[in-house]
Amino acid sequence: MTTHTPAGGPLGRLSLSRLISRRAQSIDASGIRRVFDLAAKMKDPINLSIGQPDFPVPTVMKEAAKAAIDADRNGYTVTQGIPELLHAIWQHLKLNVGWHGPTDELGAVVTSGTSGGIILAAMALLDEGDEMVIPDPYFVMYNQLGKLTGGTMVRCDTYPDFRMTAERIERCITPRTKAVLLCSPSNPCGTVLSGAELKDIVDLCRRKHVLLISDEIYDEFCFSDARENGKCPSPAQFSDECLLIRGFGKTYGCTGWRLGYVAGPKDIVQEIAKFQQYTYVCAPSMAQWGVVPSFGVDLSPMVADYEKRRQMVVDTFAGITSVPRPGGAFYAFVEVPKRLGMTGQQFIEQAIEHRVLVIPGNVFSSRDTHFRISFATRPDKLAEGLGILRGMMTA
């Protein structure tokens, strides 16, 4: 009797390395997650790395989610999202950016987080060799979208002020460009583009026949000095041909609920919904019901508190190093002073020795010159951590 020897070797345990795809092998684990894992092992760390609000979910949203569970609304929803939430989204977009939907041209789909919306949008748009322009620095998942979809991410260098302007974007556009992915307010820099800058980008994309994707997960975290007419500037105010991606997790402190939405050209939104059918199926049902009343929540006290924390960061490093003033979100992208002769990675390794956790800039960029601070932490802890970082720079 002949025994078959599998390609991975003699009979016995599976050769797992042979089974893992080249796609998976090409993607590194998130540098942010590595810092989170380190924080879990440290005793009393000063954690300035985590990118989620430190305030509780508004009571009205908790009650709505609990009521949905108690009413046995725990099964699948339609892929696009429950009608009640879609209605609330369109009412909000009408007031916020002037979009009147749904129409034959405009559609929306509720997604499993904004990250879910972004990956589904990339899947719907990119074929092998297609290009998408992303900012550098970028949110960590942006740079991996090419490996996940077969497309190519073209990094738009925004140093030193971290403003992704039309002039900078145009240098990156080629005949293979399908889309420009913009994030304002941005992660990791907190940059908020002005209405004039956004209109220039809208005009550029229209002229080049390129789709503008606007990741606005932090749109409610826009500080008073960056708001225009009381709102966070958005390219959607100038065009209904951009793809708008927003969410609830960062805004209302419910990041674990995994809920966002994509709105924009209906033909593209329908393709995103099709991919959702075969991946996430639908966004979490009880979370959808939970956020229906969210648009009526007053966030101004929380945003004002974060604006004060922003000022703590800016004041700490004034005259010591370069920190472009964040206009929103809850991050600052801090340059390691050149006189120290250190990379961002080397600096954060020393910070860890002082119990301070920040994220090295090379997680978000092709450069290794900066680090990201999250000021979404208690003011006393923030002050302690900032004092240590300042001391490291001035020692």
Model-assigned labels for residue ranges:
Residues T2-D28, F36-M42, I46, I50-A68, ...:
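PLP-dependent class I/II
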Residues G75-Y76, Y218:
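Intrinsically disordered, tyrosine-centered linear signaling motifs in cytosolic regions
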Residues Q80-G81:
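Short beta-strand to alpha-helix junction loop
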